[in-house]
Structure formats: structure tokens, C-alpha cells
């Protein structure tokens, strides 16, 4: 599970990542990344933590399917959060196909999107 201190929870933070960050889409998800954003909510920290949030709409499926997708995405981000620059804000938005995708497909799409956002991947 993704640690609590690495979770994106505030509406303003989601809006910042989506509106001011870069975006890469894949078949099952879209990833928004705002690199090196400072956290105004933690003024005492010297190195701001990278935080991730997830958006899974009703278009993905019923509640059980949406929650399954969210759990899978949180688990996948836990292993990848250290690859991102400190202070980054990441929003992973699941597309309707994510409900039918298996864990491996979500992992491939997330890896491809992050690689592209970090400048190491081709289209």
C-alpha cells in the first residue's frame, strides 16, 4: 500500500497536478506529473515528498471494480514513487478500459507513461 505521507488528498493539489503538470495517456490510464512542486502544507520539511493521487470514475465500472483498480494502482505506485523527483505531484486517472485490464497491463501502461514523462521513453 502507498504510505499515507505519499498520498495526494487535497483538491487544490489535484488541480495543480492536472492543470499545471505534463500529461501522458495510455490505453488504460492517463498520468499527470507536476515535477518538483513545493508542498505549501508542510513548511518545515527540507525535502518535500513525492505525492500521488488516483481518479477512478464511474465509467470504469461498479464500486467493486473501481476499488480494485484503485488498490492495484496504489500498489503499483508504491514501488515507483522513489523514481520521481522529490516534491512531485502525480495524478493517475483510470480510463474505462482499466476495469477490464489485469495487473500486468496496468503496470505496463504506468511504466510507459512514467518513462515518457521523465524523458526516457518514446511514443
Curated annotation (Swiss-Prot):
Its EC number is 3.1.26.5. It catalyses: Endonucleolytic cleavage of RNA, removing 5'-extranucleotides from tRNA precursor. It is an enzyme of class 3 (hydrolase). Keywords: Endonuclease, Hydrolase, Nuclease, RNA-binding, tRNA processing. The keyword Cell inner membrane does not apply. GO terms for biological process: tRNA 3'-end processing; tRNA 5'-leader removal. It comes from the Bacteria. The gene is rnpA. NCBIfam families: rnpA. HAMAP family: RNase_P. Belongs to the RnpA family. The keyword Cell wall biogenesis/degradation does not apply. PANTHER family: RIBONUCLEASE P PROTEIN COMPONENT. Gene3D superfamilies: 3.30.230.10. It comes from Streptomyces coelicolor (strain ATCC BAA-471 / A3(2) / M145). This is Ribonuclease P protein component. SUPFAM superfamilies: Ribosomal protein S5 domain 2-like. Consists of a catalytic RNA component (M1 or rnpB) and a protein subunit. One of its GO terms (molecular function) is tRNA binding.
Amino acid at each position: 500500500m502507498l504510505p499515507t505521507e505519499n498520498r495526494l488528498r487535497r483538491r487544490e493539489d489535484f488541480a495543480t497536478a492536472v492543470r499545471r503538470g505534463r500529461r501522458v495517456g495510455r490505453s488504460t490510464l492517463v498520468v499527470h506529473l507536476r515535477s518538483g512542486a513545493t508542498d505549501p502544507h508542510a513548511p518545515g520539511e527540507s525535502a518535500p515528498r513525492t505525492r500521488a493521487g488516483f481518479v477512478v470514475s464511474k465509467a470504469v465500472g461498479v464500486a467493486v471494480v473501481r476499488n480494485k483498480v484503485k488498490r492495484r494502482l496504489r500498489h503499483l505506485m508504491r514501488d515507483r514513487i522513489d523514481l520521481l523527483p522529490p516534491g512531485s505531484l502525480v495524478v493517475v486517472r483510470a480510463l474505462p478500459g482499466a476495469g477490464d485490464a489485469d495487473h500486468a497491463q496496468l503496470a505496463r501502461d504506468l511504466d510507459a507513461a512514467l518513462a515518457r514523462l521523465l524523458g526516457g521513453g518514446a511514443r
